[in-house]
Regions:
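Pre-recognition alpha-helix immediately N-terminal to the DNA-recognition helix
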Residues: 9, 36-40, 99, 126
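N-terminal leader segment of winged-helix/HTH proteins
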Residues: 1-28, 162-165
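Short, hydrophobic-biased segments on the C-terminal half of alpha helices
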Residues: 50, 68-69
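C-terminal regulatory/oligomerization modules of transcriptional regulators
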Residues: 1, 122-166
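Alpha-helical linker/hinge and terminal dimerization helices associated
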Residues: 10-13, 17-21, 57, 100, ...
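N-terminal helix-turn-helix DNA-binding core of bacterial DNA-binding proteins
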Residues: 19-63
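Charged, amphipathic alpha-helical coiled-coil/dimerization segments
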Residues: 69-129
């Protein structure tokens, strides 16, 4: 019997983790992105620069802005220019947002911390190391893929308009 782990096994594991995180956000009545923004803003002390959210999350700026709009529409956050800036914005939790985060988001975060804490310290370091290595290599492969596609597209575009004098 073959006991080798396959990429399909790994993908299923990652999909399962994504599903669990989605269950946390769904239980709070928020999208995955809005939930993440709420947790990050709360753990940052109640205010966080939008630029920090966009640099630390792998969502598009449009998705992050939509999530922030949801939080502001529900009365959980405000969005204002950073002090002394006419460009950079800061998300701040309202009192209602702080209460919501304490009641729903932070207990979910504590559950995640307990799950990570169930791993031995050497297991914690190993999982971080391995996932970091996999992410780096996959990111490099993605960059190479995008360069290949761009080169193919450019070659196809250069070929357009050329005619054959047959």
């Amino acid at each position: 019997m073959n006991s080798a782990v396959t990429l399909v096994d790994f993908d299923r594991l990652l999909n399962g983790l994504d599903h669990i995180y989605s269950e946390f956000s769904r239980a709070c009545g928020l999208s995955d992105c809005a939930y993440g923004m709420l947790v990050d803003t709360s753990t940052a002390g109640g205010s966080i620069a939008v630029s920090r959210l966009t640099s630390e999350w792998f969502y598009s700026k449009q998705t992050i802005n939509s999530a922030i709009k949801t939080l502001t529409a529900r009365g959980f956050a405000t969005l204002e220019y950073a002090e002394g800036s006419r460009k950079n914005k800061v998300v701040s939790l309202t009192e209602e947002g702080r209460r919501f985060a304490e009641r729903y988001a932070l207990p979910a975060l504590k559950a995640e911390q307990r799950a990570f804490g169930a791993l031995e310290p050497c297991e914690q370091r190993e999982i971080i190391r391995l996932i970091g290595k996999f992410s780096q290599v996959l990111g490099d492969e993605c960059d190479a893929f995008k360069q290949h596609i761009a080169a193919e597209s450019q070659a196809e575009n250069q070929g357009e308009g050329e005619s054959c004098d047959c």
